[in-house]
Curated annotation (Swiss-Prot):
It catalyses: ATP + H2O + cellular proteinSide 1 = ADP + phosphate + cellular proteinSide 2. The keyword Metal-binding applies. Residues 565-584, 840-902 are annotated as: Disordered. The lineage of its organism: Bacteria, Pseudomonadati, Pseudomonadota, Gammaproteobacteria, Alteromonadales. The gene is secA. This is Protein translocase subunit SecA. It is a peripheral membrane protein.
Amino acid sequence: MFSSILRKVFGSRNDRLLKKLRKNVDAINALEAEFEKLSDEALKAKTDEFKARIEKGEALDNILVEAFATVREASKRVYGMRHFDVQMLGGQVLHEGKISEMRTGEGKTLTATLPTYLNALSGKGVHVVTVNDYLARRDAEWSNQLFTFLGMRVGCNIPGMSPEQKRDAYQADVTYGTNNEFGFDYLRDNMAFSPQDRVQRPLNYAVVDEVDSILIDEARTPLIISGQAEDSSELYRRINTIIPKLVQQEKEDEEGQEGDGDYTIDLKAKQIHLTERGQLHVEEILHEESLLPEGESLFAAGNISLLHHINAALRAHKLFSKDVDYIVKEDQIVIVDEHTGRTMEGRRWSEGLHQAVEAKEGVRIQNENQTLASITFQNYFRLYNKLAGMTGTADTEAFEFNHIYGLETVVIPTNRPMQRKDMPDLIYLTAEEKYEAIVEDIKACVKRGQPTLVGTVSIENSELISRILKKSKIPHKVLNAKFHEHEADIVAQAGKPGAVTIATNMAGRGTDIVLGGNWQAELEKIENPTESQIEKVKAAWKESHDAVLAAGGLHIIGTERHESRRIDNQLRGRSGRQGDPGSSRFYLSLDDALMRIFASEKMGNMMKRLGMERGEAIEHPWVTRAIENAQRKVEGRNFDIRKQLLEYDDVANDQRKVIYEQRNELLDEGDISETIAVIREDVVSSVVDEYIPPQSLEEMWDVSGLEERMRADFAVDLPIKTWLENDDKLYEEKLRERILNEVVDAYKQKEAVVGEQVLRQFEKAVMLQNLDSHWKEHLAAMDHLRQGIHLRGYAQKNPKQEYKRESFALFSEMLEALKVEVITILARVKVQAEEDVQKVEEQRRQADDVPKNFEHEDATAAPEEASDQVRTQVREGAKVGRNDPCPCGSGKKYKQCHGKLK
């Protein structure tokens, strides 16, 4: 209450920021008349003028007012579109490296041209990041006209381009592309075979469109480049036949009472576990199939791979559903993004899950993958000097943006007041009743000529509603990942009178639904249209537009609540753009996923006791509030998962930075002999210390062992015993120095034979080849460490601290092993001529040329530390769970009834 009084007196931080930015908007508006008088040439010349001023040391902030005025005037001449004052506010927020929340239809694409132009003047490049290839291409083509007019070049970075095309796109002043492609290019550059293979410039400034989708929804899933490992497709097929023989058990085994099922499912955590009975049953089947030797346990150390296959197959069959989590397309499993409903072509699940799904669906099984490089979006986007974002729904996640990315969210007011009417949710007992009510609502909209957008959470649901509408003979269009090629056409006409469009939650996002339909799309169908044809199309559109306005604008129907309030708000936000009228309503049932998890059995019993008849619904603000509270819980849990993923990845990120920095230095250096000399001294000293411990008695020295080791590792025959017999003053330091000198002399002799240039090339090739192979193995070791680290919680240890400690130890061991291997190879290998160097280079290139997968994998952070162990209690009869119905028959939960007495 006190804070709300303070806000009324002093205004919120958001209000104060906007008030400050409005001063610049007034200054830009004051320049408008002056800039209107400039010729096209004079306006274009402004770009060179600004660049010259920046080169002399002038700050971008000092040029902002004139640069924004230049872009506004250029836009008027190129597109006939003038930036509104609210777009000027949004542009300034983006330039300051903040998130600009602008409602759907407020012109985010046009707003982005302002800070993009200003920051591109520095010559360091600007990246505009979009959610898919279609939007990247569309926005690049659209903005190209404006930037070309202003003397700048636009590039587009999409999958499938050659390195030359990518390099050209990155050299442009402004580069449009998808988040995945920018991230993969960064990883590829750090795996480059030579400096010429790199495509990116240093990361300068990024404007992220639909920033919530990219930095939050997709932040739980790291980008991974992987190569294929050994073929185990036959084993996947055989394990696949075992799963249908297993039976699900509803509850986990309890003390003294074992269930009769083989596995249990945890829907919230999306996990599946074998019961004790299930383990024995699986072992029995594996013995019969000759996959497990008689008398051996599934959990024996040698059978870890078999257990891994069983778990993957169980998850594939019981947790992943066709047309919800994936689709089958051209003999391949294509993942469906749970957040956007789009297909993720070329992406694969890790840990053998993808192969298990392939076996389940009977398509060709592709080999398992080995991680070659990986990064999370959190750590990739934090590499930019300045990061900004825009979306229609960021305010609900403002804390996360600030906490993880250091980005402040500024809510920009709408150009015209919002007129959309958001109606309370309707809740039905069953899904069948819910769909009947939805169809009735659609029929009413069609009858009055009101366009309808029906939002679903999965492809399966969108196709179910489509089938129901077909039965009712209602014409409609379906927009989901299966038909994303026609996305723009469907969205363009979704605002026509009486049009019905079914879309998975975020399909079509980024394209406005214009009331009355899109007249420009109609015009494109006519070849070389005449003036009269253009006028005819515009007149027809005006008639449709007015009819839709009279019918109430676009009506949004939500068929289910999403886990996140933000995604529900995005669906609502498709209606009511630019002050247009509109309406929205969500239809729910107790069968919905969110309601199954969070709505208690009590609510269902209460609805039945109220004597609700078929087709009746509950409509009350309390219910809507309860659902939003449930969504808040899920959002909080998802935030914790993302935060935890980041905390674990930060450990790997520090190591990644060190390796990538070293690797890039090696690539750019022509001569690394000084580095090799330093490493050689370290390695020789370590070897000597093993056999002659520092500050030890001569009796403790293993001289013959040291002689043998020097012969084996460094290919030098050193009579160390003779040296010691002949020289009484030859102690540790002097001996170490003499051994090192002998190793260096032997290497110099090799250099004299082979030639300095050849040896320098050989050193670089060996160093890079070994760095890459050791880093690859280290990533696999880190993966394995990560998968089991949560078990340390049972030993009362903090898994995060343990992970940090052990990963540091692994990293140190990897660096030591790398040093030893490089020096011993250089010492032992006989380099005859340049052909030998080329052989090593060829090996490196072959290792680099293996087929790679570019994956945006599902990842879950390692579970938090386990709770403290508690004393075991002996109980008579089965345990009653706190959330189970009370055995007394009251219908209440146990914790609310007799459980209160405990």
